[in-house]
């Protein structure tokens, strides 16, 4: 029996300004969000010392999906739509991506240091 191994890549606590929100005070100015992304990808049987970079995935791809790949001129009514966009970006960019988890914390509504937000988990087909 062959095990199905996955490599888990993570980028945590990226602070990003995104047009999001449903309240009038949120709809015209970008809101500060803290985004963390975890992606599970198919991996080779082994990573030997001379394994090429292409056998893995760059964590920069996760950072890109949560920052520069987010459209600056689009208003996301819900932060769930922001998470969906991050997931879609990673699934489209690499067929090896099997699962994406996106955690988003809305920094502007924290009153006592608490984390208020969502976590979305998507699996490829």
Task: Provide a role label for each language-model segment.
Residues 1-125:
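N-terminal, polar/charged subdomain of small-to-medium soluble alpha/beta proteins
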């Amino acid at each position: 029996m062959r095990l199905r191994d996955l490599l888990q890549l993570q980028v945590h606590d990226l602070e990003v300004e995104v047009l999001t929100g449903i309240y009038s005070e949120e709809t015209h100015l970008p809101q500060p969000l803290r985004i963390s992304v975890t992606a599970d990808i198919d991996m080779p049987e082994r990573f030997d010392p001379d394994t090429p970079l292409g056998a893995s995935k760059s964590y920069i791809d996760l950072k890109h999906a949560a920052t520069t790949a987010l459209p600056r001129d689009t208003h996301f009514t819900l932060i769930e739509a922001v998470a969906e966009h991050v997931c879609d970006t990673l699934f489209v960019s690499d067929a090896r991506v099997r699962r994406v988890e996106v955690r988003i914390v809305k920094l502007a509504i924290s009153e006592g240091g608490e984390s208020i937000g969502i976590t979305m988990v998507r699996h490829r087909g």
